[in-house]
Amino acid sequence: MTTPITASGDQPPHANTPQPDNTLPDGPPPGSDPKGAAADNSDKKLSLFRLLLRDKFATVAAAVLVLVGLVAVFGPMLMGDLATKQNLMFANKAPFTLANGWEYFLGSDSLGRSVLGRLVVATRTTISVALPAVGIALVIGSLWGVWAGYHRGWRETVSMRIADVIMSFPSLLLAVVVLYVFNPSIANIVLILAITRIPIYLRTARAESAELQSRTFVDAARTFGARPNAIIGRHVIPVVLPTLLTLATLEFCYVMLAESSLSFLGIGIQPPDVSWGLMVAQGRQYLQTAWWLSILPGLAIVVTTIAANVLAAWLRIATDPAQRWRLALPRKRLIARIPVKTEESK
C-alpha cells in the first residue's frame, strides 16, 4: 500500500507515527506481587474456623462444648451401669484419688454410686433436654417470625399479640405450674420450655425480616416475579440465620439452667433418671460432709454456661461483616488502631 502524497510533496505527519498498542498485558503489572495479592484476598476471606483459632477464649469455649457433646453421646456407653450400681462399702468416698479405682476418682454418694458415672449420664440427660427445646423453639419461632415480618399487615399484628401473651407469663413459673399439674417427664419439660422460648425467636426474626423486605435485592426479586416463599427462602432466611444462631447459643444456656432449676425444685427430671440439677438437689443435704456431691455438678453447669456465652459473643462478631475485622487483625495491630488521647490532643 502506497503512502498518500500531499500537494506540497510531503507525507502527512501521521504516516510514520507508530500506533499505540491497546491490548492488555497477559501477565501482572510490573512491580506487582501476584502471590502477595492472593494472600491478601485469602486473608479477607478467612473462614470461621481460622477466625476461631485466632481467639484463644473462643477456642477454649468451643473445645469445652465439643467435649460436653462427646461425653453426652459416648459417655453412657462407656460407663455402663456405673451410675446406678450401689456399693455401701464405698459410700461418701472423697474425690481426686485413685485408691478406690478410677471409677471413684470423683468420689461417691451416700449409696456408694460413682459420681463420675452419674455426671456422665447426667450430661446426656441435660443435653437431651436443652438441645431439643432450643431446636424446636428456633425452627418454629424463626419461620413464624420471618413469615410475619415479610407479609406485615394482620399477620404481623396477630403474631406479635400471641408473642406478648406468652411472654406476659414468667417462663419458669409457667413451667412450674404445668409440670406440677402434669407428669414431669423429659418430653413435657422439653415441650413447655420450647413453647415459652418461641416468642424470643419470633420477635427477633420478625424485626429482621420486616427490615429486609424493603431492601433493593428483595424488591428486585419481587419485580422479576419470584414467589414470596422463594424470596423468603433464598434472600431473607440466609441473612437472618446468623443472628438467630447466636441467639440460640444464648438460649441454650437459659434452657439448661431452667432444667437444672426445675430438677432442683423436684418437678424436673425424676429418679431413676439423673441430671446435673437433680444431682445438686440430692447432694445439698451433704454439703458439710460430702461437698463434692453438689459442687461438681454445679461446676459442670457453670463451666458449660460460661463456654456457651463466650462462644455466642464470638459468633456475634464473626457473623457481623461490620465487626468481623476485629477478629481478622492480630491483637497488636488491633491495639495500634485504637486512638490514644495524649495531652497535646487534649
Residue ranges and their predicted role:
Residues M1-L138, S142, V146, W154, ...:
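Gly/Trp-centered helix-boundary motif
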Residues S47-L51, S114-V121, T157-M167, V178, ...:
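Short amphipathic alpha-helical coupling elements at transmembrane boundaries
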Residues V71, I198, L202, E251, ...:
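Alpha-helical transmembrane segments
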Residues G75-A83, G149-G153, V178-P184, T196, ...:
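Short helix-capping/hinge motifs at transmembrane helix termini and TM-loop junctions
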Residues F105, D109, I136-G141, V146-R215, ...:
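Generic hydrophobic transmembrane alpha-helix motif, especially the helices
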Residues R113-S128, P132, R152-M160, Q213-S214, ...:
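Amphipathic cytosolic juxtamembrane alpha-helices at the membrane-cytosol interface
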Residues L131, G135, V139, L244-F252, ...:
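Hydrophobic alpha-helical segments of membrane proteins
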Residues M167, V178-V181, L193, A207-S209, ...:
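Glycine-rich helix-loop "coupling/hinge" segments at transmembrane-helix boundaries
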